[in-house]
Structures are given as C-alpha cells and as structure tokens.
A protein has these predicted regions:
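Inter-motif core of Ras-like GTPase G domains
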Residues: 155-161
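Short hydrophobic/aromatic-enriched beta-strand-loop microsegments
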Residues: 33-37, 92-98
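Short internal beta-strands
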Residues: 68-78
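Short, well-ordered, mixed-charge alpha-helical segments that flank or form enzyme active sites
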Residues: 47-48, 79-82, 122-124
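Core dinuclear metal-dependent hydrolase active-site scaffold
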Residues: 1-30, 98-153
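Active-site metal-binding motif and surrounding structural segment of the metallo-beta-lactamase
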Residues: 12, 18-70
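Short, aromatic/basic amphipathic alpha-helical patches
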Residues: 81-92
Length: 161
C-alpha cells in the first residue's frame, strides 16, 4: 500500500509531516518521541498535514522530553503550521517553528541543511534539501522539475565530502 511522502535520517531528522505520519510510526516503529527536528519540503497536503501536530500535545501524546519538536519550513508551510498552532492551542513546549529561506543554510541536530528552491507549485514554497553531517551528505529532492539556474549554481557550490 502506498502512503504519502516522508523520510527519516538516523532516527533523528524527519522529512515532511503528512497525514500518514502515525501510520508510518506504527508500521516502521519510527521513534516519534525522540525526533526533535522536522524539515518540510512544501505545503501540499501529501507532505504537510498541520492538523496532525496536535497529536504531540498533552492528552494525546506522552513524551518524556522537555525539548519541543522544531519544524523548519519555508513561507507557505510555516504559515500553515503557525495557523495550526493557534487553532489547536498547541503549547510552545510541544512545537517550535522556524521560518527558512531557500539558499540559507541552518544547523539542527548535528546536520547542516541547505534548502534549495525547487521547481513545483510556487504557492507551496517548494524546496529540496542538501543535508550534511560529518563526512556524509544527501540530496533529498522530490516533487521538482528541472531546477532553475540559481538552484543548480547552489548545488554546484556545495562542499562535497
């Protein structure tokens, strides 16, 4: 059976948060209580289903961590997540939101992550990710067509292990 797009790296970094997140947890025993960072590729519902974040709230989840899960998303996804936090009255102790911009690298959980502009529905603020940790790197690129010149230049300029 096909489910919606999601990936996990080292049981620490989650990529995308679709409605199937809980199903993925059940089927593959994803340690959702240990994941502290989630990067969002774009705001289409098969990659981001903001209503699902309320399941991290008290009454639904029993997470023995004092550190909230941080979601990193470009403008459209960030706005959808912020709306869900307000709508479901989610505490800052459960969720932390970070607005990212294409081509501006950031660090989280030991990874250096570079969001790169994807070619997809512009309203969804699409990005692909170059992810690096220690001497390993990964390009996570889906739901994109041919990349623009700026994105190709960014990829070529990235340091390779």
């Amino acid at each position: 059976m096909r489910t919606r797009s999601q990936a996990i790296i080292d049981d620490r970094l989650l990529i995308d948060f679709p409605a199937d997140t809980y199903a993925h947890y059940l089927k593959w025993n994803i340690p959702l209580d240990k994941i502290k960072a989630c990067i969002i590729t774009h705001s289409h519902s098969d990659h981001l289903y903001p209503a699902e974040i309320q399941m991290r709230s008290a009454g639904f989840a029993h997470i023995n961590s004092v550190k909230p899960q941080t979601f990193y998303a470009a403008e459209s996804g960030y706005n959808m997540l912020a709306d869900a936090v307000k709508k479901y009255n989610i505490s800052e102790n459960d969720i932390n939101l970070k607005l990212i911009k294409p081509f501006e690298s950031f660090e989280t959980e030991g990874y250096v992550i570079t969001p790169i502009k994807a070619t997809h529905d512009e309203k969804s603020s699409p990005v692909i990710y170059a992810i690096k940790k220690d001497e390993k790197s990964l390009l996570y690129a889906n739901d994109t067509s041919e990349l623009c010149e700026e994105s190709m230049a960014c990829l070529k300029a990235l340091e390779r292990p």
